[in-house]
């Protein structure tokens, strides 16, 4: 989605957000018995999937990078502290749903004149996951300018821990881009980490 769409009016942006979230809710209504890859999901628990496939290997590799001076020790410590909080949260009643897994604003197409949604693209990383894992990309780059994340939350039942978990997923994913040869955007990483710190503070106040 071109940044020029930021200049569309409020009504157009909200209609766009409503259409995007309607599409997301449709594929989130497709469920499965287990979490994991589309072709071979093997995990009974979302936390088990995330810890084994993402959290543990990512943190181990980031620690190695940090020891070699290629990843900030301060950023690593933030992720370690956030991980401890994440792992101590109840998993709640999560169920495996179909997610896009990379639905940031650049993977959404719209008509240049009307901002009418025309397509979702690049669903190459789709998996069976907790629906919350599809939400952090909605806030990536300038997604918040369209209210995508808040629109989703207003149209679906969410957990009291959603904001923290989504912030955690975002910071972990951004840090892990170093391990995949992906493009590192320091601005987005700093914004994600700042949001994570705020959500950690809120969560600690609840506990």
Write out the residue ranges for each language-model feature.
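Charged catalytic carboxylate motif
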Residues: 19, 78, 144
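Active-site catalytic-loop/activation-segment of kinase and kinase-like phosphoryl-transfer enzymes
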Residues: 40-88
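Helix-rich C-terminal or lid/interface subdomains of diverse kinases
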Residues: 125, 136-207
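ATP-binding pocket architecture of kinase catalytic cores
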Residues: 1-41
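Conserved acidic
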Residues: 12-16, 95, 162
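A glycine-centered beta->alpha junction motif in the catalytic cores
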Residues: 1-10, 32, 59-64, 172-187
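Surface-exposed helix-capping loop/turn segments at secondary-structure junctions
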Residues: 28-39, 64-68, 90-95, 158
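Active-site acidic catalytic loop and adjacent metal/ATP-binding pocket
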Residues: 27, 80-135
């Amino acid at each position: 989605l071109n940044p020029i769409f930021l200049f569309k009016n409020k009504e157009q942006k909200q209609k766009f957000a409503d259409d995007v979230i309607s599409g997301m809710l449709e594929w989130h209504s497709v469920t499965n018995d287990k979490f994991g890859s589309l072709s071979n999901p093997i995990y009974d628990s979302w936390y088990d999937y995330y810890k084994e496939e993402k959290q543990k290997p990512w943190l181990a590799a980031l620690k190695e990078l940090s020891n070699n001076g290629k990843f900030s020790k301060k950023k690593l410590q933030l992720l370690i502290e956030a991980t401890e909080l994440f792992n101590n949260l109840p998993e709640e009643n999560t169920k495996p749903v179909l997610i896009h897994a990379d639905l940031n604003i650049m993977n959404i197409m719209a008509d240049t004149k009307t901002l009418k949604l025309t397509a979702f693209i690049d669903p190459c990383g789709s998996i069976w996951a907790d629906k919350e894992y599809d939400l952090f990309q909605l806030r990536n780059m300038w997604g918040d300018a369209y209210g995508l994340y808040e629109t989703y939350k207003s149209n679906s039942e969410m957990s009291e821990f959603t904001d923290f978990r989504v912030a955690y997923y975002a910071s972990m994913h951004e840090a892990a881009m170093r391990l995949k040869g992906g493009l590192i955007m320091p601005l987005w990483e700093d914004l994600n980490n700042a949001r994570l710190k705020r959500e950690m503070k809120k969560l600690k106040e609840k506990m």
